[in-house]
Amino acid sequence: VRSRCMDKDVPVNVILPQEYSDTMQYPVVYLLHGYSDKYTSWSREGVVGRLADMYNFVVVMPDGGYDSWYFDSPVVKEYRYETFVSQELVSYVDSCYSTIKDRKGRAITGLSMGGHGAFYIAMKHQDTFSCMGSLSGGLDIRPFTKKWNIAGRLGAYEQYPERWEENTVINMTHLLTPGSMNIVFECGTGDFFYKVNCNMHDKLLKEGIPHDYYVRPGGHSWTYWLRNIKYQFMYFSDCFNKKTK
């Protein structure tokens, strides 16, 4: 997909349900990969393809770069993945496929860096998405200032603490109002992001924001993500079928 804002072509993997027909309009799940992965990463073992068939979803998996964290980076101007995913990609998908061209038919989720990205993009673009999810997401990046080149996207924490404070998902809950988004997230108890996910859950509870939060045994691994992505799709299916938000 050509990104005008980044002036480059971005690889995107699109899975259509087996019964796809131009006479129907389908909900779309935008599925984001993690740090060091790429647009093909979620395709492993055919799990997502089977879920697309089961729920009749179009699934869109963009390349988020090795370490973009899905920000519009103030440091590296050619990293504008928030704008790409929320605007250019959605526009492209709606023009090329028979989709529900409304927030009620769009969800966004991802794993790890992509879980952060999904929450980050959805919270800032609630007019575009009605559902947001995360598996093992980095929902608070502040404890990890030296990790995964986040500093390469935001600048060093020591120099630009305000950028880290403004762009960590856990500090963005003021953008939500009760019922404004359908929210589902989960994390394994053995995951290094477990504590920040629990903190996010506690903060949403305190602020009266309805959400589903699941904790299961497991670590930061493809075994965990491939086993549990089905619960996100189940949740999105329920939301799309209600069509209330």
Range-by-range predicted roles:
Residues 1-245:
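Non-catalytic cap/lid and distal C-terminal segments of serine-dependent acyl enzymes
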